[in-house]
From Swiss-Prot:
One of its GO terms (cellular component) is photosystem II reaction center. It is a single-pass membrane protein. The lineage of its organism: Eukaryota, Viridiplantae, Streptophyta, Embryophyta, Tracheophyta. This is Photosystem II reaction center protein J. Gene3D superfamilies: 6.10.250.2070. The gene is psbJ.
Amino acid sequence: MVDTTGRIPLWLVGTVAGILVIGLIGIFFYGSYSGLGSSL
């Protein structure tokens, strides 16, 4: 299968993107819960 992303598999891009999104959301909620969200 040949996709438009080149040598990088689409599922790998989706997985990395998902992990980054979950990580950012987790950091955001953790920061706001611990009182650091207002400074960010």
